Amino acid sequence: MGQKIHPVGFRLGITKEHKSRWFADKYHYPELLQEDRKIRQYVEKNLSNAGISDIRIERKADQVDIEIHTARPGVVVGRGGSGIEALRVGLQNALGGHRQIRINVVEVARVDADATLIAEYIAQQLERRVSFRRVVRQAIQRAQRAEVKGIKVQVSGRLNGAEIARTEWIREGRVPLHTLRADIDFAYRTAKTIYGILGVKIWVFKGEIIPGQEEQAPAQPATTPKRQRRRQQFEDRSNE
């Protein structure tokens, strides 16, 4: 049943953290939850070309700290910080203006190993009517060059305009969904084509996280030196 549950929600509190970190009583919780939703929708809509990977929100009294993980920090920051200032003003207007907003931009270290960015890339290519097999193969090759331990890509819908919808998936390497200490990055995106909506799901296995230790490196097989064969010596008996 490992495929029936969200891999990130399954590991919350073990190897994954919540994307919104704050506390509220039962009277203010719905309001703050709606604010988080508005913040995420506003950022994703206005920075759709910046390669947004993750948005984390923290709250302290009337202060909201927003951490944006992006593949293109220059697009978010803008010239002289004008982009961040415009984003902050827009968010304050959207939330009513009574919140103090601070924005921190974090660059994604490995773009080709991020499940969200891989899913967005595949969805964009499918909307341009590129063959799904070619797109998936390219995405997997790029992820392998980024040295991930394993990746699984699933595409569902009317693939290549087929009359009957189907689901196809490709996996390279290990993707242990039942292992709780496994660092699984998951993302889901939809591609709107002229034939209908295609669903794209990405699982990326980045290694195992053991408490108190660094990320476990895969065991390398011990290499034994090859024995050199001695060349046989033949006696010269031609004169006998």
From Swiss-Prot:
Residues 214-240 are annotated as: Disordered. Residues 39-109 form the KH type-2 domain. Disulfide bonds: none annotated. GO terms for molecular function: mRNA binding; rRNA binding; structural constituent of ribosome. Gene3D superfamilies: 3.30.300.20, Ribosomal protein S3, C-terminal domain. One of its GO terms (cellular component) is cytosolic small ribosomal subunit. Keywords: Ribonucleoprotein, Ribosomal protein, RNA-binding, rRNA-binding. InterPro entries: KH_dom (IPR004087), KH_dom-like_a/b (IPR015946), KH_dom_type_2 (IPR004044), KH_sf_prok-type (IPR009019), Ribosomal_S3_C_sf (IPR036419), Ribosomal_uS3_bac-typ (IPR005704), Ribosomal_uS3_C (IPR001351), Ribosomal_uS3_CS (IPR018280). GO terms for biological process: translation. CDD domains: KH-II_30S_S3. Binds the lower part of the 30S subunit head. Binds mRNA in the 70S ribosome, positioning it for translation. PANTHER family: 30S/40S RIBOSOMAL PROTEIN S3, SMALL RIBOSOMAL SUBUNIT PROTEIN US3C. Belongs to the universal ribosomal protein uS3 family. HAMAP family: Ribosomal_uS3_B (MF_01309_B). Part of the 30S ribosomal subunit. Forms a tight complex with proteins S10 and S14. This is Small ribosomal subunit protein uS3. The lineage of its organism: Bacteria, Bacillati, Cyanobacteriota, Cyanophyceae, Oscillatoriophycideae.
